[in-house]
Amino acid sequence: MSTMLIAVILLTLLALFFGVLLGFAALKFKVEGNPIVDELEAILPQTQCGQCGYPGCRPYAEAIANGDKVNKCPPGGTATMEKLASLMGVEPEPLNAEAQSQVKKVAYIREDECIGCTKCIQACPVDAIIGAGKLMHTVLTADCTGCDLCVEPCPVDCIDMVPVTQNLKNWNWRLNAIPVTLIQETPHEEKRG
């Protein structure tokens, strides 16, 4: 046998041995995550805004699993809070006074003043701001959670938080609240003549 063939076979056997060893170690020393934290995190809106007092949704989910209150997520609103309370088996509470706002606000960039520095784009946790370097930026209001993280880094102070005015596009129609009654059809008797 040639030296080259022996080297290839030896390296293949060595790679196979270490592959099996790593596979065994991965199964033997597997670290399980907390499934409750994963479920809580799936319920949270994933805005990573920090309005709850934690640096993101995962740390807040871990805090809830450790006994923290479920009413600290403003972007999620009452619906998210009720789902969290149901999962944790606690009574739903009103949203935290600091978290509760009567009118939803979104970021608004005064485009004529924007210098295109991209600092607001980098600060936005939900990618609701579009634009490019040295060009005007704008906010996708449908995606904006109102977390206010884009206002601080703006060097020219051209970002305002404005209330969302309700119109036909964003009105909460609550179609599931309309009462629906099922009417049973009764067979008609044939007319006799």
Swiss-Prot record:
Keywords recorded for this protein, A-Z: 4Fe-4S, Cell inner membrane, Cell membrane, Electron transport, Iron, Iron-sulfur, Membrane, Metal-binding, Repeat, Translocase, Transport
Sites where the protein binds [4Fe-4S] cluster 2: 114, 117, 120, 154
Keyword DNA repair: no
Note accompanying the cofactor annotation: Binds 3 [4Fe-4S] clusters.
Any one Gene Ontology BP term: electron transport chain
UniProt domain 4Fe-4S ferredoxin-type: residue ranges: 105-134, 136-164
Gene3D superfamilies associated with the record: 3.30.70.20, Electron transport complex subunit B, putative Fe-S cluster
E.C. designation(s): 7.-.-.-
Cellular location(s): Cell inner membrane
SUPFAM superfamilies: 4Fe-4S ferredoxins
Binding site for [4Fe-4S] cluster 1: 49, 52, 57, 73
Domain 4Fe-4S: start-end pairs: 32-90
Record region (Hydrophobic): 1-26
UniProt GO cellular component terms: plasma membrane
InterPro entries linked to this entry: 4Fe-4S_dom, 4Fe4S_Fe-S-bd, 4Fe4S_Fe_S_CS, Elect_transpt_cplx_RnfB/RsxB, RnfB/RsxB_Proteobac, RnfB_subfamily
One GO MF term attached to the UniProt entry: electron transfer activity
Pfam families given in the database record: Fer4_21 (PF14697), FeS (PF04060)
Coiled coil: none
Binding locations of [4Fe-4S] cluster 3: 124, 144, 147, 150
Highest taxon of the lineage: Bacteria
HAMAP family per record: RsxB_RnfB (MF_00463)
Family: Belongs to the 4Fe4S bacterial-type ferredoxin family. RnfB subfamily.
PANTHER family on file: ION-TRANSLOCATING OXIDOREDUCTASE COMPLEX SUBUNIT B, OXIDOREDUCTASE
Biological function: Part of a membrane-bound complex that couples electron transfer with translocation of ions across the membrane.
Assembly with partners or alone: The complex is composed of six subunits: RnfA, RnfB, RnfC, RnfD, RnfE and RnfG.
Name of the protein in its database record: Ion-translocating oxidoreductase complex subunit B
Originating organism: Shewanella oneidensis (strain ATCC 700550 / JCM 31522 / CIP 106686 / LMG 19005 / NCIMB 14063 / MR-1)
